[in-house]
């Protein structure tokens, strides 16, 4: 008689597969679009990542351009050779820090990067990837206060444009970090601390809830009208993009603050809410038309304005935590750029095979390669590194 064997996955990274009589584990078959074209300039790029505040201080005049960090937290100016304040230091004897881990600044800026371009090029680098440079309270800048403005501690808009012009002279490219899943609680969009002229979501809804909680007979609609009148009387302005409606803020106080949805529970990073609407038939950031216009659709949108200022593309932070339809639209909008085809790079940590159809990202951060290298260099695990790399080869077509 005939012998029947099934061949399937052996559940090991880079393994050879296995046979069984029945119920073999399924293996992945990668499907991709052979006409999927990515920017040619990126294919031979050697990329150098820079955390701007710690790279080089090229202009000491901008070191004092801000007086506070998040809320009323002070800004700490550290000496270049000092260690940043961090929880490990807090456990040491004689610790004298403030136990705030993101308010110490060392003065690195765009001018500093520009002054070191000869050195950077001597390493064979032709593309820079900068961690976020938009106006933000922290030193890491993943808590945007204003997406459209460069942080004054990094430089001015004119300095940034001069920087990108110099890069183009050198045939170099610039990738910026786009953090569009969340913002800072100290921002023009949220304004938890009441610092900005534009009405932010937290000051708006906290005022509404305060009125409702102080007067149980007051309807939500009346509280909204009273809040609008109050804020306008104070000289506040409502953004035409409706910042005050971008977030989920509830009438429930937790630790003295009205509860809101935040990235991984960090209250400094309120998340853009997904809502029902017409763009897609489920809750999505794309259905928030004002937000989508602001980030990508408008002629002077965040994504387009930075490209117009000389950037070559975007690395999209926590890309898998934003609706994929949002990124499909993002791609359509940016790929119409006539000056140069911009790069769209997703922060994806695991297998990215599902993105090979050419309608989302041009590529992703190669963290799987990173993991294999760290495993080998730190732990000396050559076999483990080989298995991880073989798994990448299996998943990604050449």
Name what the model sees in each region:
Residues 32, 51-53, 275, 347, ...:
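Structured loops at beta-to-helix junctions and adjacent beta-edge loops in soluble globular domains
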Residues 58-86, 192-282, 382-395:
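Core domains of carbohydrate- and sulfate-ester-processing enzymes
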